[in-house]
Amino acid sequence: NRNAKLRILDGERLMAEADSAGEVCVIDVPSAERWDIDSPKLYTCEVALETGDVQRVKFGFRDIEFRADGFYLNGRRVFMRGLNRHQSYPYMGYAAPESLQREDARILKEELCCNAVRTSHYPQSQYFIDECDRLGLLVFTELPGWQHIGDERWKEQACENLREMILQYRNHPSIVLWGVRINESVDDDAFYARTNAIAHELDPSRPTSGVRYIQKSSLLEDVYSYNDFSHTGDNPGCKPKHAVMSSRKKALLISEHTGHMYPTKSYDTWSH
């Protein structure tokens, strides 16, 4: 282990500092402001090793909790209103530059009046998440995949993808939920017990969820995320909680609803 000096900065102003000879260091910042969707206060954590290496990371202080009746940020109930986001662009695919990544976050927050975004169905650019931190957008990010669950070797890789995602993104205050299921996959209790445990071990401060389109499927996570495509235009809207979940003691998050605005595959029909 190397000795390290940690400093918490508000801009250039020193808020707190401490020395550490191990991997864990606890610092009290009694005058810190909380990060919120309306006032997304960010601080800088600077770690300097005695060898001269220095690393600076932006972060924020906030309390998050999902209860049976919804999401709470810093003790205040917040109705999450957001969209799913893919980071592909015409002519450049997933190689979008920083400016476009940040612009998408701005559009979501300022033009579409969202307070949340789901990075479907994979971790996305650090530039995008950085801007969510700065603007005050709540983020639900999940391990990559869609509908398919493979063999044991495939599952090991999925677990490793989850570990890497959490270690890379866990300092972002905007991220409030880890997605530990493969999007719209069938129940696999043994596999998803593993992914849920990995997330809680690496980051006990955040709840877990997993997106499914199955009603009353196994709930191993902290939040039940459900893609509700029941709306046809004639019915009132999404299904009630008791029709979707076998237990109403945990929160229900509608992760998608209604359906695509236009066909996305050759076998889709306009009537769907």
Regions found by a protein language model. Give the residues of each.
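Secreted/periplasmic carbohydrate-active enzymes, especially glycoside hydrolases
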Residues: 1-139, 161, 176-177, 198-201
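Substrate-binding/catalytic cleft of secreted carbohydrate-active enzymes
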Residues: 106, 110, 116-272
